[in-house]
């Protein structure tokens, strides 16, 4: 799952655009953004250590050739939304930027956004993109200097029928509701690259990437909830309007210096900023009454504003000394330093709109919350505003030193051996849950992480690989703060006493390349996880999910098969650089996970959270190229079993 993977961008750690997750959504990275994507499931000393499943490295696109300019436009229709009366909340503009203005105080009604959603008709999914670049030659040595820029905008609509059902630990159903959810997703992405080569020995590159992603939704839910009046079988209505407005800005400076014919220096820095906003979340609950519905009293009418600011600085410097092996000349010795310094600052303001004057709403088909919640009724004491503040900070500092050697002893044998030392310091300070949870905690760990990777070439087309390594998984910021987040179908709360997990990894892989562009691969893997982290349901009157080290250890084992096959490749007539190609890809895996939890009723253990036993991906791609023009059409099928 998300917890055990790591995503890097040009070799630097990349945070998610959504603070809810560890890894960024790969949906942002189309062919106009990426040069290549590498997936590594065997780990070495120079790579990421906070990983247990796979490291996904995205290499950003650079200019190819002397220059180019391209445009793109696309549209689509969702049959569930195109002709529907689509509910859209107030406060988000065409570009997806939300109005984040909070009231100056709680002594008057001065919220900027309306409570009543509007109705929109004829929703069309759409996207636009533009890209271009130019190459220049500088100085008497004609050193190449290139610029590349791409940007895009996407809007799409979704409609979902939802069932929300919650039970207590004893099995009693306390929530059973059916809902309709209307969601609009708006995003923009921009990538700029400047690349400079000096005398074919030194290289400097700068990348700027900005991602803005807004998801806004209106959900209407009817049914049973224990918070509703028991005079009418706990029946009622809930409307939840939520916006998640997130921004990720990435700045990268990368350099490579050829010091001698055998010695080079790689150095660089990356500064990432994440702004995660949930502005003016609106929750309203109406309980069933004799003549219709009434607004529920207590803390059941809320407006909520939260902000998460994350600053993420990454630095690295490494020396590479190339060794003579008189075979493929791939042997080398590497040693260096990497550092990652992350500051998370979270603040949330909750406004409880306590009901004083109860008025009856005859029908849910036509009602207005703005007719009740306004300045006139506030001045008449129909309701009061109570303000609550929550905040926490998490600081994470990781210093790493590594050394590794790669040597090709014979045309068949290649060995990579490495050692990495990580010093991890994490500190969390919190004052949350209306002052009910105050405190701080620290995680301080020293990791010695050995790795060994062997490759044996059976012949020109077959090879065997063996990987043995130790890695770890750190808790996310939200998982070690006891702030309780209120979701539509569950509440979740962090655990400041959570400990990191240690991973011991073993991978054995067979590769068969019938042709240079085709592949058949079979992998068997085993992992031992100490102190595995999982999300669990806490036995309490409130009923919420939290994070725990659920066992002393867990085991993971499985097999994976991958096939890349060219069905046909034909030249295009009357084209010097033409190709008509049809290819297919298949990737499938089976994963067995087991953790034996103390005091569990099932003594045989249970599978880890988020681990799907069966995963299958299939694609059929047609690529037509003629000169500088190309057309790619791909059919993709995915299957993921129940987790």
Q: Each predicted region: which residue ranges?
A:
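Short acidic/polar hinge/loop motifs at secondary-structure boundaries
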Residues: 12-41, 61, 86-87
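Surface-exposed extracellular loop regions of Gram-negative outer-membrane beta-barrel proteins
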Residues: 13, 275, 343, 367-382, ...
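Transmembrane beta-barrel wall of Gram-negative outer-membrane proteins
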Residues: 113-220, 450-452
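Gram-negative outer-membrane beta-barrel transporters
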Residues: 524-528, 545-642
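Signature of Gram-negative outer-membrane beta-barrel scaffolds
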Residues: 302, 306, 322, 328-459, ...
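Transmembrane beta-strands of outer-membrane beta-barrel pores
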Residues: 75-79, 151-157, 210-214, 271-277, ...
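Outer membrane beta-barrel strand-and-loop segments of large Gram-negative receptors
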Residues: 296, 308, 312, 316-318, ...
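Short loop/turn motifs that connect adjacent beta-strands in outer-membrane beta-barrel proteins
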Residues: 63-68, 137-145, 200-201, 260-264, ...
């Amino acid at each position: 799952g998300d917890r055990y993977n790591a995503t890097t961008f040009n070799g630097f750690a990349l945070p998610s655009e959504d603070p809810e997750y560890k890894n960024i959504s790969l949906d942002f990275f189309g062919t106009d953004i990426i040069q290549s994507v590498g997936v590594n499931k065997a780990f070495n000393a120079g790579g990421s250590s906070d990983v247990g499943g796979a490291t996904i490295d995205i290499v950003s696109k650079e200019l190819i050739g002397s220059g180019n300019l391209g445009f793109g436009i696309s549209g689509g229709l969702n049959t569930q939304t195109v002709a529907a009366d689509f509910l859209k909340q107030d406060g988000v503009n065409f570009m997806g930027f939300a109005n984040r203005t909070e009231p100056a105080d709680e002594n008057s009604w001065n919220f900027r956004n309306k409570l009543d959603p509007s109705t929109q008709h004829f929703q069309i999914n759409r996207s636009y993109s533009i890209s271009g670049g130019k190459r220049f030659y500088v100085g008497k040595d004609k050193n190449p200097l290139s610029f590349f820029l791409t940007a895009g905008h996407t809007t799409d609509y979704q409609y979902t029928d939802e069932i929300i059902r919650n039970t207590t630990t004893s099995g009693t159903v306390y929530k059973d509701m059916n809902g309709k959810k209307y969601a609009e997703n708006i995003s923009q992405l921009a990538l700029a690259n400047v690349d400079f080569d000096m005398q074919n020995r030194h290289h400097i590159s700068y990348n700027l990437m900005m991602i803005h992603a807004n998801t806004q939704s209106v959900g209407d839910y009817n049914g049973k909830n224990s918070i509703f009046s028991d005079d009418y079988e706990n029946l009622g209505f809930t409307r939840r309007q939520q916006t998640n407005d997130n921004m990720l800005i990435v700045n990268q400076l990368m350099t490579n210096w050829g010091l001698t014919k055998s010695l080079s220096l790689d150095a660089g820095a990356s500064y990432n900023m994440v702004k995660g906003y949930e502005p003016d979340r609106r929750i309203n609950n109406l309980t069933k009454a004799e003549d219709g519905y009434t607004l529920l009293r207590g803390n059941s009418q809320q407006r909520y504003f939260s902000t998460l600011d994350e600053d993420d600085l990454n630095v690295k410097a490494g020396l590479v000394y190339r060794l003579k092996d008189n075979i493929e000349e791939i042997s080398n010795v590497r040693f260096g330093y990497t550092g990652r310094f992350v500051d998370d600052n979270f603040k949330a303001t909750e406004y409880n709109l306590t009901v004083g004057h109860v008025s009856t709403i005859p029908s849910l088909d036509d009602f207005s919350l703005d007719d009740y919640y306004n300045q006139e009724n506030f001045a008449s004491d129909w309701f009061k505003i109570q303000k609550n503040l929550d905040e926490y900070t998490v600081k994470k500092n990781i210093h790493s030193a590594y050394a590794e050697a790669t040597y090709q002893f014979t045309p068949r044998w290649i060995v990579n051996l490495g050692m990495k030392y990580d010093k991890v310091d994490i500190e969390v300070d919190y004052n949350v849950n209306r002052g009910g949870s105050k405190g701080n905690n620290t995680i301080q760990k020293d990791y010695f992480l050995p790795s060994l990777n062997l490759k044996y070439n059976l012949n020109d087309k077959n090879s065997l690989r063996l990987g043995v390594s130790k890695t770890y998984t750190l808790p996310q910021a939200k998982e070690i703060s006891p702030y309780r987040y209120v979701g539509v179908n569950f509440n979740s709360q962090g655990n400041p006493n959570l400990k990191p997990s240690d991973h011991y990894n073993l991978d054995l892989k067979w590769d068969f390349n019938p042709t240079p562009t085709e592949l058949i691969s079979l992998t068997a893997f085993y992992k031992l996880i100490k102190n595995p982290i999982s999300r669990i349901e806490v036995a309490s009157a409130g009923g919420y999910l939290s994070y725990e080290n659920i066992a002393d250890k867990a085991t993971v084992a499985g097999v994976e098969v991958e096939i890349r096959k060219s069905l046909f490749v034909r030249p295009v007539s009357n084209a010097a650089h033409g190709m008509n190609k049809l290819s297919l890809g298949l990737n499938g895996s089976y994963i067995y996970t087991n953790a034996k939890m103390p005091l569990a009723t099932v003594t045989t253990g249970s599978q880890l959270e988020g681990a799907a036993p069966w995963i299958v991906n299939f694609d059929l791609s047609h690529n037509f190229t003629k000169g500088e023009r190309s057309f790619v059409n791909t059919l993709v099928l995915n299957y993921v079993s129940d987790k």
